[in-house]
Amino acid sequence: MNEAMATDSPRRPSRCTGGVVVRPQAVTEQSYMESVVTFLQDVVPQAYSGTPLTEEKEKIVWVRFENADLNDTSRNLEFHEIHSTGNEPPLLIMIGYSDGMQVWSIPISGEAQELFSVRHGPIRAARILPAPQFGAQKCDNFAEKRPLLGVCKSIGSSGTSPPYCCVDLYSLRTGEMVKSIQFKTPIYDLHCNKRILVVVLQEKIAAFDSCTFTKKFFVTSCYPCPGPNMNPIALGSRWLAYAENKLIRCHQSRGGACGDNIQSYTATVISAAKTLKSGLTMVGKVVTQLTGTLPSGVTEDDVAIHSNSRRSPLVPGIITVIDTETVGEGQVLVSEDSDSDGIVAHFPAHEKPVCCMAFNTSGMLLVTTDTLGHDFHVFQILTHPWSSSQCAVHHLYTLHRGETEAKVQDICFSHDCRWVVVSTLRGTSHVFPINPYGGQPCVRTHMSPRVVNRMSRFQKSAGLEEIEQELTSKQGGRCSPVPGLSSSPSGSPLHGKLNSQDSYNNFTNNNPGNPRLSPLPSLMVVMPLAQIKQPMTLGTITKRTGPYLFGAGCFSIKAPCKVKPPPQISPSKSMGGEFCVAAIFGTSRSWFANNAGLKREKDQSKQVVVESLYIISCYGTLVEHMMEPRPLSTAPKISDDTPLEMMTSPRASWTLVRTPQWNELQPPFNANHPLLLAADAVQYYQFLLAGLVPPGSPGPITRHGSYDSLASDHSGQEDEEWLSQVEIVTHTGPHRRLWMGPQFQFKTIHPSGQTTVISSSSSVLQSHGPSDTPQPLLDFDTDDLDLNSLRIQPVRSDPVSMPGSSRPVSDRRGVSTVIDAASGTFDRSVTLLEVCGSWPEGFGLRHMSSMEHTEEGLRERLADAMAESPSRDVVGSGTELQREGSIETLSNSSGSTSGSIPRNFDGYRSPLPTNESQPLSLFPTGFP
């Protein structure tokens, strides 16, 4: 019996790390009656039920999804074959307790693995530092100690510093502390990337080099925020964004926040209530002046704000983005007297203080929120190499959450930047659809596994992978964001009708000029498609029940059986009922929970349109939500521009919260520990990238297979930065190249003194007398060419067979072909063959006299004309040659996208004349 229970338990010890392994549990939906019964069972006190006490769990203070070497897809060679092997990076979760912390890893197999667990007092912030970028001129002083863990504890290593005033760096390889950074004021958060370690203080920011941990720069002009983030910042791969306390006009970028213009019934009612409140406040001020007492309606915070405004005129809602590589050392000061070195952008984002912000993976999109939490702004940052004043900041979206106030604590992007999830302290995660380039989200943009091309229906690819069949079978056309276009491969988007927004999009994407010039992008207001609510009470999730669904996109967890005190919250949270939430997008891992006996399909993750959303709350339960966008069900007709709706449902859950009975898992770790293996792999890749000798290698690493390719004075800094120098903003090319249309023709120029067979099946020759002198190719004046003197096939059939019709040969002789690219029509009274050169006087007449009145001769001459006609070169642009009996009709239509030539003609089967000494020349239609 005990063995059976041990087998069914979702927890078991890990073989490689020694920690705990938690298997995912399937989430089952309950009916309304089952939910009511479960609620009544939870409300009944434990003493009346007589059931044993549940397992006690430790209190969680904060949760976070971490990015480290373990899930670094760019530098870990294990993930470079991600598309072929199906290998996906694991999810890395950090949980902070009132006594210690814990680190979990969830690989693609779905089994959560405990990697680290300690109990050393309260921990306010912790980060697993990624391996830094280094080269020949920049070495990593802690390479042998990595991976490193940065921790901000209540009691530092020295024991004499104030609480939360030092950052201790521990080696997970050896277990020793390698560095301690002391501060005089409390630390509120830690951020890190491959270049720097950022320590966030109140109204200050300090950055340290990731290789030496020496101070690189610091910022002292941050605007204070009441919480939950006392000093909100956003750290990308290279840029750092923070809230500035003033707006400096000389550094202000073009653009910034636009008016939201959101008017609703709720907003009107709340505005009226605020107006009434302001009126009552004015009455209270009059009472204050008469009685000399402070009315109860005015809080101390309001007085402090007014006093601060009198001392120093601070401006809320200002964002400054700096480049951590070029900002220089020392203090970063944005003032009228300072230069703009290292300042990327400086712009107003909100009217209220900024509460939270986050970059997307590319660093070009920035989402900001204010303290009210009504609206979230999405900005596109287009930099300029000269100064921040030349930078353009486009306000693409306003994500409208609601009219009630809420504090934002977490923001995350999907990997393709088409979805944004904003989580508040109320435990609600709001899912918004966006486009990386702006525009209204719709079926065309969010119902495909790919980010659709904005300007064309075609999937622009380098040919590295096959185009998925869903793009052509399930979607209209080829997922073009431009409505009303033909799905034909040759259809030009210029023939479609564009609305005002699409016209602007065409202008901005095709305009290689200044993005600061008008018209600026029009602001889009987007509502959330899903609101996923977290439970307000902690519950025990069993294998049978699991979380319970109370509605689409809203679930609740079973309440505990025994009475417990309210959960402990973060030190920065002062209001009751607030708890921490973190979210991230990732590949589905619920297949194991739903089909434990089946194997994972190889390409199962590539078939979904949206990745799964993972949400973890302060109760230690990680839940995977499946997201299924679909066209709006109330839409009368489904088209490319149909709005979206979304269905969300929980699929699997992991109970990661630890109990007091769990053992600690502390370094030093074994060599096969996942964190150590990932650190070794990333450092090895860094050595190869810098051209250095990795530790343990038998010999030097050379580039291009030759040691001579590395010069003695080779600069490793240039090789180190080659990835960051890749252009990340490009401009789309024209929809139709010049040579794709009928406005150009390919013609053959024959020099004098040669005889050329025009067609292998034709007897038409081009020859000269022996007295002629050969001339080099294209060495002549076009004005000297007398095309009217050419006698090239002077007899041809009429376009329409008319009885008794006869025209002189001289009427049609030597007239050049005219093709109008705009209208797509041909001049039917012209010949189809043009040859530049001179012919013997009697050659054409002798050839004509033998076949002039025979049908066979007519067919042969037409075949020769087709073999050398310019119309063969523009077949794809709309020219179509059809044969009906003995009548050949040359027709063209601007709407046609494919051409056809009768294959029973000899000229169609005969190849073009090939002569290596006679290249093809490109001439416009107007060539004489």
UniProtKB/Swiss-Prot annotation:
InterPro entries: BCAS3-like, BCAS3_dom, BCAS3_WD40, WD40/YVTN_repeat-like_dom_sf, WD40_repeat_dom_sf. It holds the Pfam family BCAS3. Changing residue 350 to A: No effect on recruitment to preautophagosomal structure in response to mitophagy. No effect on interaction with PHAF1. It comes from Homo sapiens (Human). Changing residue 400 to A: Decreases recruitment to preautophagosomal structure in response to mitophagy. No effect on interaction with PHAF1. One of its GO terms (cellular component) is cytoplasmic microtubule. Expressed in stomach, liver, lung, kidney, prostate, testis, thyroid gland, adrenal gland, brain, heart, skeletal muscle, colon, spleen, small intestine, placenta, blood leukocyte and mammary epithelial cells. Expressed in undifferentiated ES cells. Expressed in blood islands and nascent blood vessels derived from differentiated ES cells into embryoid bodies (BD). Expressed in endothelial cells. Not detected in brain. Expressed in brain tumors (at protein level). Expressed in brain. Highly expressed in breast cancers and in glioma cell lines. It comes from the Eukaryota. The modification Phosphoserine is found at residues 461, 480, 488, 838, 886, 898. The keyword Transcription regulation applies. It is linked to A chromosomal aberration involving BCAS3 has been found in some breast carcinoma cell lines. Translocation t(17;20)(q23;q13) with BCAS4. Hengel-Maroofian-Schols syndrome: An autosomal recessive disorder characterized by severe global developmental delay apparent from infancy or early childhood. Affected individuals have delayed walking or inability to walk, impaired intellectual development with poor or absent speech, lower limb spasticity, poor overall growth, and dysmorphic facial features. Some patients develop seizures. Brain imaging shows thinning of the posterior part of the corpus callosum, delayed myelination, and cerebral and cerebellar atrophy. GO terms for biological process: angiogenesis; autophagy; cell-cell signaling; cellular response to estrogen stimulus; positive regulation of catalytic activity; positive regulation of endothelial cell migration; positive regulation of transcription by RNA polymerase II; regulation of actin cytoskeleton organization. The modification N-acetylmethionine is found at residue 1. There is a cross-link at residue 215 (Glycyl lysine isopeptide (Lys-Gly) (interchain with G-Cter in SUMO2)). Residues 480-494, 505-514, 755-771, 887-901 have a biased composition (Low complexity). Induction: By estrogen. Belongs to the BCAS3 family. WD repeats lie at residues 69-114. It is found in: Nucleus; Cytoplasm; Cytoplasm, Cytoskeleton; Preautophagosomal structure. This is BCAS3 microtubule associated cell migration factor. Has been proposed to contain 7 WD repeats. This prediction could not be reproduced. The gene is BCAS3.
